[in-house]
């Protein structure tokens, strides 16, 4: 799990990073990775990666002076409405409201 997190964090801004690339980097099959990940987490790898990206975006919005668009793109989100929807679902505020607070 630690190695998975390290690889995912290293690739947060890469909107093209895939599960297949993760498997290659970890030298495991997709099936092995899904099984192992599911046994220690209640999320899929894709959901976990999205959560990491959202938390990084939240951090950037509160500390870096980035606007919402910059934070979304810096964390691998290409679609701003998708980013806003997922941010709201994760944190209970849309990213613009959150940004205004900081």
Model region roles, listed by residue range:
Residues 25-26, 37, 75-76, 87:
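Core residues of bacterial helix-turn-helix
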Residues 20-21, 32, 70:
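Alpha-helical residues within helix-turn-helix
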Residues 29-30, 78-79:
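Short coil turns linking two alpha-helices in DNA-binding domains
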Residues 32-33, 82-83, 87:
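Short hydrophobic/aromatic patch on the recognition helix
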Residues 85-102:
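…primarily DNA-binding HTH/wHTH and HhH modules…
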Residues 5-17, 37, 41, 58-67, ...:
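Basic, amphipathic alpha-helical hairpins
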